[in-house]
Amino acid sequence: MRSLILLSVAGAVVAAASSGECDEHFRSSQQTAIADVEARSDELKAVNQAIWNFAEVGLEEHQSASLLVSKLKQNGFEVEHGVSDMPTAFVASYGSGKPIIGILAEYDALPGMSQKVQPERLPLQEGAAGHACGHSGLGTGALGAALAVKASIEKHNLKGTLRLYGTPAEETVIGKVYMLLDGQFDDLDVCLHWHPSTRTNVWAGSSKALISAKFTFDGISAHAAGSPENGRSALDAVELMNVGVNFMREHTKEDARLHYVITNGGGAPNVVPPKATVWYFVRADKHEDVEYYFKWVRDIAEGAEKMTRTKLSVQIDTDCHELIQNTPLSELLFAN
């Protein structure tokens, strides 16, 4: 699996920090790590399948996180569970001193994407969540890499600290952002990540910056047939906002992405909806563009508020910059 590349580089960093004979020491420690992964093949496949079947959405990955934590504890890692005020986030540590190497694990599923392990569309459970982005394998691969590097540290008496970060809610870009703000990554020397794909390669690209926000409009309920003039429709405000954003699209750069879903649109058609919420993702290659577009979206929302005489509130869930690629580290990955 591609996580073998990840563990090779982790081993390289540890070996380089602990030996003057870097190349020979690294190759030996690398072979130990690879052998450990191969020996654990059945165990790791079972973990992957279990997390696939759990299929828990962001911030609700209780069984998935518990399984990973139990495997880490069984193998001598010290684990802090529920870090950064997120019950399904954790930090597992092994070793001591420098360098401090981090490995990122994800394990959240996507709502409505339940799927059996086959190429045709066939849900395990209709309407349930599923691992459409392969995070069952991502978390398992990170676990396998951490255990393999730990085996190498033990056998070759390598110095350094290895950390596996359990980062929940990747699909909504929450876990890592909140952990970063909480200082969980402050003392790292290097942090490694991987993602399941259709091919094995070193990805040297970037990812889009993003702001995730919920726009809630509060109106006035009324009977839609008997006295609609007494009501103020929050759903009208949401719809007008969405229309405005859809016309906005023509005037954005090609890399911009504007996604939304109405999470609350009222309770019954014969009642003027007193509350409605729409959830937006605003993305672009550069964070400065995301900030510009988000202000534009917010201006449109405020216009909808005025047109419908409702009251707008905005909740920003997360705000994330684009990925800054580490070219020397990518070259080290490719070489190993």
Regions found by a protein language model. Name each.
Residues 186-336:
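Midchain, well-structured core segments that form catalytic/ion-binding scaffolds
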Residues 1-16:
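Fungal secretory targeting signals
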Residues 131-140, 228-236:
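Short, conserved micro-motifs enriched in small and acidic residues
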Residues 137-207:
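Acidic/histidine-rich catalytic neighborhood of metal-dependent amide-processing enzymes
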Residues 51, 92, 103, 135, ...:
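Divalent metal-coordination and catalytic microenvironments
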Residues 18-131, 140-160:
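Acidic/His- and Gly-rich active-site-bordering loop/insert found
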Residues 56-57, 165-169, 317-322:
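Conserved short loop/turn motifs at secondary-structure junctions
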